[in-house]
Amino acid sequence: MSFLNLEELPFVGMSHEFVGEKQGVPFSAYVVTAKPGQGPPLHTHPYSEVAFTIEGTATITVGDETREVKAGGIVVVPANTPHRFVNSGKTPLRQIDIHAGPKFVQSNL
């Protein structure tokens, strides 16, 4: 069992990274803080992902569908499905991304 503080996790790019492999669990989580206009390129993961929007507004593309997602929105991304998000609001975007894998694996498209 571990008790951690968010600030103890490494901050890489735009997120604090909870890497399951380092914590002895089979999933990973990323606490994202994205500035307006910021987001990753279109990409895939070999596992499923669930994104919980906590604050702000994101434009999220999953496969061929693009939607605006606001605080409280949840997006499920199947494994190997192209997806991306961008902070489309005027304030910071905060979201928690849960990856169904013990380490981060991403293929940019």
Task: Locate each region found by the language model.
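A short glycine-rich, His/Asp/Glu-containing loop-to-beta-strand
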Residues: 6-42, 98
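Short histidine-centered beta-strand/loop micro-motifs
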Residues: 19-21, 39-45, 86-88, 107-108
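Short, conserved beta-strand element in jelly-roll/cupin
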Residues: 33-35, 45-60
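Histidine-centered metal-chelating micro-motifs
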Residues: 39-40, 59, 75, 79-84
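Structural motif
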Residues: 57-59, 66, 82, 92
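Short acidic-glycine-tyrosine-enriched beta hairpin
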Residues: 65-79
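Ligand-binding loop in jelly-roll beta-barrel domains
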Residues: 79-104
